[in-house]
Amino acid sequence: MQIRLFHLQNSRSQRIIWFLEELGLNYELITKYHSDEDKNNNSPHQLSKFPTLEIIEQEQTSILAETSAILDYFSHLHPQLGQNNLLNQQLQNFYYWKNYCEATFIPDLVLKQIFHQIAERTPFLVRFVPKLLKYGFDQGYLNQSLQRHMSMIDKHLERHLWFAGDQFTTADILMWFPLLACSQNYSQFKHIQRYLVQIENRPAFKNALIKGQWSASTFQTYWAIAW
C-alpha cells in the first residue's frame, strides 16, 4: 500500500501526520500553505478537503478524507491505537471522547473563528455590526460553552492518564488540536496542561511537528485573535 497525504499547514490535518508517525507507516507528504497558489498541492478531494489521503493499492487509487474516517479506517488495519485491549469503561470512554471531539467540541471552537472572519471581511465602515454580534454571541453563549467543555475535560483528565484510560488511543490524537487551540485562554486547567505536556513528549508527536512544518506561534496567534 502506498499512502499520499495532502496536508494543510497548521491545520487539523496535523493530527493525521502524527497518527501515521505513531503507526510507523511510510507515506508521501504533500503540504499546502495558506499563501500557496500552486494547484499541484491542492487536495484531490472534490471539496478540496484537508486532510485527504490517496491510497494506492494493487494499481488502484482511492481517496479518503475526513480526519475521523481516516483514523477509523487505518485503526481497522492497524488496531493498536484503537479499541484493542480496552476494558468496558475504557471502551465507553474511547467512543465517547472520539465522537465528542468532532461532533460537539470542535463545532463550538470553529464558531469563534467564523464570527471573527466575518467581522474581518466586512467593510470597515460597518464592521462594528458583526463585531457587536460576535461580542453578544461570545458573552451570551460561546464563552460559557467552551468553559464548560474545558472544565469537564479537566475533571476527566484528573482521573485518567489518557482519554480512554491508561492506554493512548486515537481519541487522544483527535482531542489534542481543540485543546491546544483553547489552552492559552484556559490555562487554569492544570490537568489539561499536564496532558498537553505529556503529548509533547511523545517521539512520534515531535517527528510529526517537524514533518508538518508546524508553527506554534502562528497557531497561537490565529486562535488568540478569535477570542
PLM region descriptions:
Residues 33-36, 171, 213-214:
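Conserved beta-strand edge residues that scaffold enzyme active sites
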Residues 69, 191, 204:
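Residue-level recognition of oxygen-bearing side chains
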